[in-house]
């Protein structure tokens, strides 16, 4: 469905609820009889806000074929694509972005989107050889956040970083070899400026040539014996540090 018709499937009631916030996003819904009873209030919202969207009753085996969840919730929605052009993401002069370079794991990508949404970021960009934004695991891991903020996809990492810098947003690469650590960056006032965090692949982080595209490189201090932090945790720390700095009195 994703490749042939530029449509994708959203699993579960939370995803459907979030998708309904954008008029025209939901094209059709499939639901089992049991789920129709369990989520009757949500289906009432669907009927009132999008009365032209067809709702198909299906049995358990059909739902298992439609859903990629281990335990299907019994309701899936077919939706229109999410991604926007990078130029549209940058047009409003964003103050906080997450740039994910070559992030391949759909669960991590979805969780970064969720973290960005929670931190009040203005958008996310999936760069390079990144996971498909519409992968069901990406959508599910975001818990609806893919519908809450603009998300761009761009294969040209260098071009995307240059475009972000061109609109006055400072690009900070999150990497263990950073010149500053996160606390020093915040104390210096650096994070109060419009910022895009450049985050690397789960397995090998940011290659030197990609980190070199950023205005500066910032590390997250590790005080214990852990070798590193996973991508989503690092993203949450960086994004929330920027959100705190940007929302401080007088910022």
Q: Which residue stretches match the model-derived regions?
A:
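N-terminal positively charged helical leader segments and presequences
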Residues: 1-70
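Short glycine-rich anion-binding loops that position phosphate/pyrophosphate groups of nucleotides
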Residues: 13, 34-36, 62, 82, ...
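Structured adenosyl-cofactor binding patch, chiefly the S-adenosyl-L-methionine
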Residues: 77, 115-119, 133-146, 208-251
């Amino acid at each position: 469905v994703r490749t042939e018709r530029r449509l994708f499937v959203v699993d579960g009631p939370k995803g459907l609820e979030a998708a309904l916030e954008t008029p025209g996003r939901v094209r059709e819904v499939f639901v089992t009889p049991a789920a129709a009873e369990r989520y009757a209030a949500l289906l009432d919202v669907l009927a009132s806000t999008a009365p032209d969207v067809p709702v198909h009753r299906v049995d358990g085996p059909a739902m298992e074929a439609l859903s990629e969840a281990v335990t299907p919730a019994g309701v899936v929605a077919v939706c229109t694509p999410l991604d926007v052009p990078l130029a549209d993401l940058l047009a409003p002069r964003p103050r906080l972005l997450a740039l994910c370079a070559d992030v391949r794991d759909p669960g991590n990508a979805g969780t970064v989107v969720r973290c960005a949404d929670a931190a009040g970021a203005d958008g996310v960009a999936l760069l390079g050889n990144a996971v498909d934004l519409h992968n069901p695991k990406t959508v599910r891991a975001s818990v609806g956040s893919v519908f809450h903020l603009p998300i761009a996809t761009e294969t040209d990492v260098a071009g995307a970083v240059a475009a972000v810098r061109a609109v006055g947003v400072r690009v900070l690469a999150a990497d263990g070899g950073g010149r500053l650590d996160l606390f020093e960056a915040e104390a210096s006032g650096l994070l109060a400026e419009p910022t895009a965090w450049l985050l690397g692949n789960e397995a090998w982080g940011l290659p030197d040539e990609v980190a070199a595209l950023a205005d500066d490189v910032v590390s997250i201090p590790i005080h214990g014996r852990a070798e590193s932090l996973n991508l989503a945790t690092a993203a949450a720390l960086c994004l929330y540090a920027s959100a705190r700095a940007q929302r401080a009195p007088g910022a």
